[in-house]
Design a protein with these regions (language model features):
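Short, well-structured beta-strand-loop connectors
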Residues: 125, 143-145, 159-160
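Flexible glycine-rich beta->alpha loop in the catalytic core of nucleotide-sugar glycosyltransferases
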Residues: 86, 93, 136, 147-148, ...
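Conserved beta-strand-loop-alpha-helix hinge in the C-terminal portion
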Residues: 156-179
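Beta-rich strand-turn-strand
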Residues: 118, 128-141, 147-150
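Flexible, glycine/small-residue-enriched loop-and-beta-strand segment within the central core
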Residues: 2-7, 26-38, 43-133, 162, ...
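Intrinsic low-complexity, glycine/proline- and repeat-rich
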Residues: 182-216
Length: 216
């Protein structure tokens, strides 16, 4: 048996929309597919979790063990990517002790807050990165492995750390491989903000050279 769903099987899952050349592992877990849109040339590997309101553009690779919790919305624009074991949260519970924690409790006993997470074009997120809700990772930014992203990230920058901080500018040479006319404008994508319960987080992997150079 093929490790990825066939085109016919993907159609039967019931996605809001799905493009061409999409490969999704049979070992991935898809919840609320009616709220998930996927573009062209996308690959989603083993043991990924996709839940909630998620918009995935085209030419995107989501590596193994990545979790996208889109209760309040997650948008991944074209040519972005996430490395293994990263998590993106669009909503989080209140850990102050004033409320119960988790989606199993009545709505009046929890305090969930968050907002849409937008991952712009050409963003690369390293392994074991945690992305908090209600932020934008700017076009072309790179996030080093094991980082915590809790604020907006400047475009075309290399970032790492807990919390993540800008290390230096990122080169744009990769653009020579892209025909600008082939890029989609996703700035008008609308993500409805509704949520009931649950907590969330996200991440991807960039070369460990970032850490090594910083230590040099």
């Amino acid at each position: 048996m093929n490790s990825f769903y066939t085109e016919e099987e993907l159609t039967q899952i019931g996605f809001k929309s799905i493009g061409k050349d999409v490969k999704i592992s049979r070992k991935a877990s898809i919840y609320s597919p009616q709220d998930i849109s996927i573009g062209d040339n996308v690959r989603i590997d083993d043991f990924c979790i996709l839940s909630g309101k998620i918009t995935i553009g085209s030419h995107i690779h989501i590596s193994a063990y990545v979790a996208l919790y889109g209760a309040m919305g997650i948008v991944m624009e074209d040519y972005s990517g996430i490395s293994p074991k990263s998590v993106v949260y669009s909503a989080m519970d209140d850990f102050s002790g004033d409320y119960l924690v988790g989606p199993i409790h009545p709505e009046q006993s929890i305090n969930v807050k968050g907002g849409v997470v937008i991952i712009k074009r050409f963003v690369q997120i390293g392994s074991n990165v945690v992305v908090f809700p209600k932020l934008t990772i700017g076009e072309g930014a790179a996030i080093g492995a094991c980082s915590l992203v809790n604020h907006d990230v400047e475009e075309w920058s290399i970032n790492y750390g807990v919390p993540s901080k800008k290390y230096k500018e990122r080169r744009k040479n990769l653009l020579k491989f892209i025909k600008e006319k082939g890029l989609k404008d996703m700035s008008n994508y609308e993500v409805s903000i509704n949520h009931r319960g649950g907590g969330i987080l996200r991440q991807y992997m960039v070369c460990a050279l970032i850490e090594r150079r910083a230590a040099a």
